[in-house]
Amino acid sequence: MTSFSKSDTCVIFGGSFNPPHIGHTVILSYALDYFNADFYIIPTKTPPHKVVDIDFDKRFEWVMKSFKCFDTYKKNQIFLWDLEKHIFGVNYAIKNVEYFRKYYSNTIILVGEDALGNIEKWYKYEELLNITTFAIYPRTRDGSLYKRGQQILGNLYSNVIELRDFPLIEISSSDIRKRIVEGKSIIGFVDGEILEDVTNTYLMHHKSHGGNWNE
C-alpha cells in the first residue's frame, strides 16, 4: 500500500456500524472540512469489548451504501476498507495505527466522546496515545466525558483534539436496533437505500434469538 494522495495525515474512522446511521455521515462531513487528510472508514469485524452478531459483509455493504453520498464531495480523500475482514479474531486500534504509520507521518483516530468513558479498557491505550492523536466529537450535552478523559489521561490528553464545535449526535446504533424491535420507525435514522434491509435484518435476528440480543 502507498498513500493514496499527497496528504501526510490520515484519519481512521472505525466502528462496528451496527448499523451505520445518519450520525456517522454527519460527523464525517464535518471532519472532511476540518482536517486536510485522507480518511479511512474501517468497519470492525470483531470488536474487543462487545459482541456483534450481524455478519461483517452485511455491515460492510450497509456502510458502502450509506457513504455513497460522498461520491461527489472529496471522494478522492475517502477510502472504505474491509481491512478487518481478513483478520482472524479481535483486532485493536493500535494495530491499525501501527500499519498506517508506515505510510503517513500523522495518524488520527476519529471517535465519539463516549470512548473516554472506557478509555482504560482500550488495548495499550497509553502506548496508543503516544503514537497517534484522538479527535473526539461530542456525545454528551455537558462535556462530562471530556473532563473524565482529562482526569484519566493526564499529560496524554495533549494528544486529544476536542471537536466541541461538531454537532452533538444523539442517535446511536443501539437505539436504532431498539426502535426496530419495538416496531417504531427508523426513517431518517439510516440511509434510505438500506432502510428496509436494516429493518428486516434486525427483526429476523431478534426473532431467531428468542427476543434477546447478544450486544
UniProtKB/Swiss-Prot annotation:
InterPro entries, sorted: Cyt_trans-like (IPR004821), NadD/NMNAT (IPR005248), Rossmann-like_a/b/a_fold (IPR014729)
Keywords linked to the UniProt accession: ATP-binding, NAD, Nucleotide-binding, Nucleotidyltransferase, Pyridine nucleotide biosynthesis, Transferase
Entry's EC annotation: 2.7.7.18
Reactions mediated catalytically: nicotinate beta-D-ribonucleotide + ATP + H(+) = deamido-NAD(+) + diphosphate
Gene3D superfamilies, per the entry: HUPs
Molecular function GO labels: ATP binding; nicotinate-nucleotide adenylyltransferase activity
One GO-annotated biological process of the protein: NAD biosynthetic process
Pfam family name, one: CTP_transf_like
This protein's pathway: Cofactor biosynthesis; NAD(+) biosynthesis; deamido-NAD(+) from nicotinate D-ribonucleotide: step 1/1
HAMAP family: NaMN_adenylyltr
Family: Belongs to the NadD family.
Function: Catalyzes the reversible adenylation of nicotinate mononucleotide (NaMN) to nicotinic acid adenine dinucleotide (NaAD).
Name of the protein in question: Probable nicotinate-nucleotide adenylyltransferase
Annotated organism of origin: Fervidobacterium nodosum (strain ATCC 35602 / DSM 5306 / Rt17-B1)
Classification of source organism: Bacteria, Thermotogati, Thermotogota, Thermotogae, Thermotogales
